[in-house]
Regions:
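Surface-exposed, charge/polar-rich loops and edge strands
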Residues: 1-339
Length: 339
């Protein structure tokens, strides 16, 4: 299939610059994956769709304030760094802007007592660096770092928690699993009262999630790697639900990717691993029965995933309807429920 097959026209004013308040007051486009028929609702109305025994799977990764601003020690030139992946012993893979001059041996200072030294280059233009600091690394990030919001969000966050799910637990993401931003503690309790089972997996979202597809033939695209963990009890509960014919509802594309990566045999396997799973039309779904998701960028791997799940024509028609009805798009935007 061609990249242009997943394009749609989006007016810039529909790109949400801040989250809905309260979180579950955003709009919800419910789409039947078999017929393509839709309904316009509010996110809190998802309670009306819950069947007793439904299993909702959330990604409990926590976004770190991974964007740092510093200067090159030798020249004083300004540098922006984005932390991607911890490698152990204070070594991280990062992106550096401007990166051309970030050569091995160069030192970047973010504060008087917090700096890093470039060790090597990595794939996709990254750098391997070792941090030098006194005290606690996380405290330095909290003090100096900014939340790495996507490039299409131009408004500065009023509060770091705006870009964090209410159930975020394990630090490690360079971007939020944004479908989860719509859930409030009160809504989660009401879901349990309706008979839903809430489970959690962890996938640390990498900056590769924003990397555009450059290949015209989508099959030629190389998917980025992300690290996920599924606990033994979670895997058992998902497998039991599948055996009993209960729905597995993934909250967000990262939960989808985790479940499908661990479920390639038809049963979800517990453990931790890297995944490069690339889901596009033609993929054989193994685990997920329904998806709560946001509206994704044109020609992105995420809209391809949705097209694989519900059909390209159904997805593009739903997106066109969302544009007509002036839904809010992308990370802070409104949501879809594909079921």
């Amino acid at each position: 299939m061609r990249l242009e097959d997943f394009n749609y026209v989006l007016p810039k004013e529909l790109i949400a610059q801040q989250p809905a308040e309260p979180r579950d007051s955003c709009r919800l486009l419910m789409v039947d994956k078999k017929t393509g028929e839709w309904q316009h609702r509010r996110f809190g109305d998802i309670l009306d769709e819950i069947r007793p025994g439904d299993v909702f799977v959330f990604n409990n990764t926590k976004v770190i304030p991974a964007r740092l601003f510093g200067r090159r020690k030798e020249t004083g030139g300004r540098v922006e760094a984005l932390l991607l992946t911890p490698k152990g012993n204070d070594v991280w893979e990062i992106l550096v802007n401007p990166g051309r001059k970030a050569l091995p041996g160069q030192e970047i200072e973010f504060s008087e007592n917090f700096s890093c030294t470039v060790i090597d280059k990595t794939e996709f233009g990254g750098r391997l660096v070792k941090f030098h600091y006194s005290g606690d690394f996380d405290n330095w990030l909290d003090q100096l770092g900014e939340m790495p919001t996507p490039p299409y969000i131009h408004k500065k966050l009023e509060n770091k928690d705006e870009y964090q799910t209410v159930y975020a637990k394990f630090k490690g993401s360079a971007a939020a699993p944004t479908a989860g931003l719509h859930f409030t503690p009160e809504l989660l309790e009401k879901m349990k009262d309706k008979g839903a089972e809430l489970l959690f997996v962890t996938l640390h979202v990498g900056i590769g999630t924003f990397r555009p597809v450059a290949e015209e033939n989508i099959e030629d695209h190389e998917m980025h790697r992300e690290w996920y963990t599924i606990e033994k009890e979670t895997a058992q509960k998902v497998n039991e639900a599948k055996e009993e014919g209960r729905r597995i509802i993934a909250v967000g594309t990262t939960s989808v990717r985790t479940l499908e990566s661990a479920g390639q045999t038809g049963r979800v396997e517990a453990g931790s691993s890297w995944t490069q799973l690339y889901i596009y039309p033609g993929y054989q779904w193994q685990v997920v029965d329904a998806i709560v998701t946001n509206f994704h960028l044109p020609e992105s791997t995420l809209i391809m995933m949705m097209a694989s799940f519900a059909g390209r024509e159904h997805i593009l028609a739903a997106y066109e309807e969302a544009v007509r009805q002036k839904y809010r798009f992308f990370s802070f935007g409104d949501a879809m429920f594909l079921r």
